[in-house]
Amino acid sequence: MSDFQKSFSESTSSIKFDEKYIDNSVQPNDIGIANQWAVKPVSDPCVGNLATPVNSGYFTKAFINNLPFYREGISPNFRGLETGAAFGYLLYGPFSMTGPLRNSDFALTAGLLATIGAVHILTGLLVLYNAPGKAPNVQPPDATVYNPPADLFTRTGWADFTSGFWLGGCGGAVFAWLLVGTLHLDTIMPIVKNIWTTG
């Protein structure tokens, strides 16, 4: 400990609170005090969780609740598989058509490899979210999602979701690569490539 730290700790050790400002009637073990700040009810305007026509409308609720992340009755692994397949399939196009090798013969393969690399990075981030020391955050029910999946927000559920995401992402990228490589798209591919050509 340096001289400055020692002198600072010695000067602050003598600080005492005035007894007239201490409320001894409230103890940390009181149930009412401990729980009153942890409860965040749905549609509380003080927290900003409002039921608006957008987030509580029929179309929005039907759309959000049918996404693989919130759909009822499927396992965390299948949730990850379906989400990863959508990511891999949709990321393949921008990587192959706008990548640095877009004007070469290797554009489709480079797009596949870049997409698989991006899926690996996203999978690594999902693994870090489930790092030891804290469990994944459990989403409370709100105006849009009444019943969030409880099995997903455990350590094993999130690990299953992550492994399914990796497999689905790589599989979706390979499926998009196979579709683009078919003979039916040979007439369209030069047109699409020339849209983003800069030279």
Swiss-Prot record:
Name the membrane topology term: Multi-pass membrane protein
Q: Which one Pfam family would you cite for this protein?
A: PsaL
As for family, the record states: Belongs to the PsaL family.
Instruction: Give the lineage.
Output: Bacteria, Bacillati, Cyanobacteriota, Cyanophyceae, Synechococcales
Gene Ontology cellular-component annotations: photosystem I reaction center; plasma membrane-derived thylakoid membrane
Q: Which SUPFAM superfamilies match?
A: Photosystem I reaction center subunit XI, PsaL
Instruction: List the transmembrane segments.
Output: 108-128, 165-185
Protein name (Swiss-Prot/TrEMBL): Photosystem I reaction center subunit XI
Q: Where in the cell is it found?
A: Cellular thylakoid membrane
Could you tell me which HAMAP family the record lists for this protein? Answer: PSI_PsaL
A Gene Ontology biological process in which this protein takes part is: photosynthesis
This protein's UniProt keywords: Membrane, Photosynthesis, Photosystem I, Thylakoid, Transmembrane, Transmembrane helix
InterPro entries referenced in this protein's UniProt entry, alphabetically:
PSI_PsaL, PSI_PsaL_sf, PSI_suXI
Asked whether the UniProt record includes Membrane among its keywords, one would answer: yes
Organism the protein comes from: Prochlorococcus marinus subsp. pastoris (strain CCMP1986 / NIES-2087 / MED4)
Instruction: Write down the superkingdom of origin.
Output: Bacteria
